[in-house]
Each structure stands twice: as structure tokens, then as C-alpha cells.
Amino acid sequence: KAVSKLKAQISKEYLSAVSYYCNGINEYAESHSDQILDTGIFPVSADKVIEAQHLLEIVGIQLDKPYSYLRGPKKRSKGFPNKEGSNILAVSGNHTRCGNSIIAISPHQPLEGIFSFYEIHLFYRKSGCELFGFILPITFTIFMGTNFKVAWGTTASYPDMYSVYKVGLKGVFNKRLNVTEGLIPLNRSAYFNYTLLYGKFPAPIVKQYFTTPDGKPIVKINHRYFLIDIPLIGYKLGTELNYRISHAQSNNEILALTLDYGYPYLDLVSIDTKNNILYVHNSHEPIRASEDEYMSDILSLDSLTQLDNGFEDGMFYIENPKS
């Protein structure tokens, strides 16, 4: 469902780029079968690539951290881990010896795993565009880097990425969500997970979760039920914005793209060849019932009424700061 929603919003240009990407890796896999570790994943379809790119964004939210916190000792005094991005540092030409604006990108990516660092240097013969930077697995767009007209970096705006609600369910077999207006029927889903017997032998176990009619998951942790709302799902695809930014020629163009696209959850810093600096806090937060709820780790059931009331546009930008 998320892929269908995304495809309705993705530009034809980006959909074509995804198709070309699939054609290229499928042809390579066919002609280099001896280098393919798992031939079963080929041929790769455009839908699967979009799904994987979006899943990479969802995994990047780091939902494992609040999940681990909720599963941890009950006497734990600390709240959810503080999550602040630290990928970019830019200095205005007003404060550098050379008089030029400087940007430092520190992606601190691991060399293995789903967020491993892949450094690439590309040159498009047709357009004459040259790109240098890094990409993440299953993507083909520069996440941070330069096209030698602009240089940019992004970092996650974590607090706005998800909300956790403590909820109550009724029923034994047919679970229903208990809200002020009444009982809402839920969908039940099951999946296999694995545990280690005696710390050595993997053994499959069946886990279950529930979803609301609009698709929000409800999980049981330590005998309590939590609803997890992730507004990003099916809303925007960050890799498309990266694709468009990588061809920008100035900060003004990047600002226009971010304003037009409205991609949530990423703070962006860029400089251009005229030594301009741009900072964009491009975030959307669910509207809360009170100011205190913006700082709460777990929200009450009453706050569920806020989910369908839209988003507060928290986007702002700063150009060429004086200090």
C-alpha cells in the first residue's frame, strides 16, 4: 500500500530513473552470474526498489531504540535516547581565513550493513554533470556530496519521525482498540521471529501484532500495548528529493526544491559557488494537545484524536547567517 501511495506522488522523471536503474542491475546480474551471491532476487522490479528505498528510510528512524527502551527494566529512569543529527558543519566565509564558505560532511557510516558507506564519482556525458559523494544500498542518488556547483549534507530530525501511544485493547480473540468514541476493530497479523535456545540454537517463534483500519501498527511489549505512528510511511520518498538536489546549480534552486517537495525529517545544509550558505529545517510534526506532549516519550490514549488533524508545518530556513 505504501508503494502505491508513493508512486502516485513520485514524478515521471524519477520513476524512469528507477526503471533505468533496474534495467542496468538486471543486465549486469545476468551477464555476471558468477559474481551474484543470491540469484533469486533477480530480476529486480521498480516496485521492489521503491519499497526498499522507503524501507531504508523507515529503518533509519531507528525504531529499535524506543522498542528496546520499552522492553528494558521497568525501573529505568531515563527517557528515550536523545537523537540529534551530526552529519554536517558549515562555516560562513565571514569566519574563514580564505574568505570562502566551507562545508564539512561527516556521514560516520559503517562499512557494512544496511547503512554502509558507498563513495562514488560520476560523470554524465549527456548533461555534463559531475557528482561526487556517497550513496546508500539500493539507492542510486547522492545522499550527501557535491556536483561542484553546490555541496550539501543532510541529517535526520529524529524527534518528529514517530510517536508512541499507550493504548488499551479489548477482547480475547478479536481485539478492538478502546477509545472514547467506542471500540475500533483491529486487523491481526502474524510473522516468524527467531530466538536462541540456550544461547546457541536458533528456534522459530510466532509473533503477532495488530493494525488499525488506517494501517497504524499496535504491538505488545511487556504486557502493555503501544500504537506507533510513523507519518513518513507512504508520504514522501527522500531518495527522489536527493535525486533532484544533486542536479541543482545554486542554493536558491535547492531552497525552491525543499519548499516545493516538503520532505519531512531531514535538516539540510548547503553552500554554492557564490559562498552562500543555506540551512533548512524541513520537518512536519503531528499537532499535539499540549506543549508538554511535544517532549513526552509516550503519549496518552486521548492524544490519538490528534492523529487525523493534519500536520503543523515546522519548516523554516536561514540564508547566509551573520553569526
Predicted segments, located by residue:
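Structural recognition of the beta-strand scaffold that forms the well-ordered cores
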Residues: 90, 102-104, 142-145, 150-154, ...
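Hydrophobic alpha-helical segments
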Residues: 263-323
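Compact, glycine/acidic-enriched structural inserts
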Residues: 126-203, 242-247, 256
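Generic, well-ordered alpha-helical scaffold segments in large soluble proteins
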Residues: 21-24, 28-31, 73, 94, ...
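Short helix/loop capping segments that flank catalytic or ligand/cofactor-binding pockets
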Residues: 99-100, 111-115, 120, 131-133, ...
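Short secondary-structure boundary/capping segments
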Residues: 55-60, 117-122, 158-161, 166-172, ...
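Substrate-recognition/specificity elements adjacent to catalytic centers across diverse enzyme folds
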Residues: 1-114, 119-141, 230-231
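Glycine-rich loop/turn
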Residues: 74-101, 113, 208-249, 256-266
